[in-house]
């Protein structure tokens, strides 16, 4: 079984992990109520999507 010959340094480990991060979700402002919502989803505050009321409150 293969075993590492040298210990991986902190610098090398951190360089490898530079792309290992969480991306920020795409938030847009709701045109109906002005609250921030996830893109391409129904607004949780007013229940509208694409300018139409989809969920009645």
Curated annotation (Swiss-Prot):
NCBIfam families, A to Z: rpmF_bact
Gene Ontology CC annotation, any one: large ribosomal subunit
Keyword Ribonucleoprotein attributed: yes
Family: Belongs to the bacterial ribosomal protein bL32 family.
Keywords (A to Z) from UniProt: Ribonucleoprotein, Ribosomal protein
Record GO biological process: translation
One family name in Pfam for this protein: Ribosomal_L32p
Protein name as it appears in the record: Large ribosomal subunit protein bL32
The keyword Lipid metabolism belongs to this UniProt entry's keyword annotation: no
Molecular function terms, GO-annotated: structural constituent of ribosome
Gene behind this protein: rpmF
Source species taxonomy: Bacteria, Bacillati, Bacillota, Bacilli, Bacillales
């Amino acid at each position: 079984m293969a075993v590492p010959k040298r210990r991986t340094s902190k610098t090398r480990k951190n360089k490898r992990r530079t792309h290992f991060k969480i991306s920020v979700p795409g938030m847009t402002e709701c045109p109906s109520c002005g609250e921030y919502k996830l893109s391409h989803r129904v607004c949780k505050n007013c229940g509208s999507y694409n300018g139409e009321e989809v969920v009645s409150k």
